[in-house]
Amino acid sequence: MNSIISHRGTYDSENTSLESIKNCVEKDIGIEIDLRLNKDTVYVSHDPCEPSLFFEDICSYLTNTNVQIALHIKELDAIAPSLKTLKKKNVSNFFLFTIENHKIQQKEDFQIAYYANIMPHDVSDQIIWCDESIKKWFNTETISELKNKNNQLIAISQEISTNCLLDVAQSYWKFL
């Protein structure tokens, strides 16, 4: 099964906003959200900055939805308060991932995706976040091998990481 996850939760906009998150949920489009911590508050941003969009506000739109929610933990200290907010807001259809796979400690009942920028081996996580922004590593064999292990693969689409025409992106989608 293929599905779409919106990069940084944007939909018909350039930046993540409450409106873009709401639009994704209404259109049944999954959401990838970058989370950071400022003091005790989790905020949404790809890069460190002064917080203007807070995770707790976004969670109001994520309650009772079936869209897949990918939480990209940019700072490991954001994990515990993020989980607390998710529990408080009753958000359940999510998974966490970080480029520092080994540093997420599974203490509660939540899913972790394995971040891979090369072909992963001996991965026990069910979800694999496949990133080719640094190096191309997908091919028919690697995709088949990972799928045969019952992994859910999430790939970053070409147009996110490079300038490309729509037909190039669509060709990539078919390949996946």
Labelled PLM ranges:
Residues M1-L176:
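Phosphate-group recognition and catalysis centered on beta-loop-alpha active-site segments
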